[in-house]
Amino acid sequence: MIPGNRMLMVVLLCQVLLGGATHASLIPETGKKKVAEIQGHAGGRRSGQSHELLRDFEATLLQMFGLRRRPQPSKSAVIPDYMRDLYRLQSGEEEEEEQIQGIGLEYPERPASRANTVRSFHHEEHLENIPGTSENSAFRFLFNLSIPENQVISTAELRDFREQVDQGPDWERGFHRINIYEVMKPPAEAVPGHLITRLLDTRLVHHNVTRWETFDVSPAVLRWTREKQPNYGLAIEVTHLHQTRTHQGQHVRISRSLPQGSGDWAQLRPLLVTFGHDGRGHALTRHRRAKRSPKHHPQRARKKNKNCRRHSLYVDFSDVGWNDWIVAPPGYQAFYCHGDCPFPLADHLNSTNHAIVQTLVNSVNSSIPKACCVPTELSAISMLYLDEYDKVVLKNYQEMVVEGCGCR
């Protein structure tokens, strides 16, 4: 049996989507009739038909979120700290900002200004040493990119963790160079001992700093996604300017060390991050806003006030069974609009001229309906979740929160 609170939550979500004319296209007229049927079943027996209707509406909501099916994340799925921190910055959680800045996270203003979706991909564990490179300091590693067809990638970044070098007589004044390449042909087709690559990005860094380094790999990812060229992976090369062979490549983390726990390594693995847009809504933009109201937030009763206004509606993703794949937020305050639009319409009811005329006509001819209480302003929320392929996604969803109501 499906819990009654889950069914009721789906009903409430559907009511929000059906609450205003701007959302009428999200659910067809036949769907509106089904809402009434579900409401009739919610307080009584749960028939097989009600379960079918629940599945239909869950599918509708998943489609609204741009998902073909409900994600079923594996227990081994890892949420990179970078994606959590990016979500906190995007959602404007100010109390976390100092901590985020402390680990050296830089918000990617330029990529995000053209994207409404951020995806992250860990590299496959198998690494190939590239023969013929100086001191065997170059490795090839692969990323399995699963990106929807409607997603247009604008920018891609490779993040590698670099540890401080504290060995050798010259470490305080030493530097090393990190080069990132795209592998143009598979090793089987290359001349023995020489891999065909092209340089994507390079950086000269000091030995005595521990931090993440970010490299622009957009040309390679755009070739793989837009031009549908084969993906033969990336190569990383580390060369030291003032250090012996003994210390070559020991501090740029591309593989797990033997004494290291799997949990620590999961957060230090190389991470490929793509910034894209699916043509829906607006781009991700960094902003600060007040935190959404908590789930149980008492409101003062407004006696004798039945006019159109905004009411509390907290959507808890655990109530609809989605908390296993939605990482953050655990829920959000969606609000809804409800109330009368009496004649004459007061200024605070945020009415249009047409609504004023319609209400005036209704006062003398009851066959003409009153103006309706509907959302007049809506805002977006950011969601961090695991998709159907266990990839971590940060996405901006438009028109999810009612900011204002009015008679229209």
UniProtKB/Swiss-Prot annotation:
Signal peptide: 1-19
Cited InterPro entries: BMP4_TGF_beta-like, Cystine-knot_cytokine, TGF-b_C, TGF-b_propeptide, TGF-beta-rel, TGFb_CS
Entry's Gene Ontology BP terms: blood vessel endothelial cell proliferation involved in sprouting angiogenesis; BMP signaling pathway; branching involved in ureteric bud morphogenesis; chondrocyte differentiation; deltoid tuberosity development; endochondral ossification; glomerular capillary formation; heart induction
Keywords on record: Chondrogenesis, Cleavage on pair of basic residues, Cytokine, Developmental protein, Differentiation, Disulfide bond, Extracellular matrix, Glycoprotein, Growth factor, Osteogenesis, Phosphoprotein, Secreted, Signal
Propeptide feature ranges: 20-292
Pfam families per the UniProt record, alphabetical: TGF_beta, TGFb_propeptide
Gene Ontology molecular-function annotations: BMP receptor binding; chemoattractant activity; cytokine activity; growth factor activity
SMART domains registered for this protein in UniProt: TGFB
Annotated stretches, region: Disordered: 284-307
Protein name stated in the entry: Bone morphogenetic protein 4
Gene: BMP4
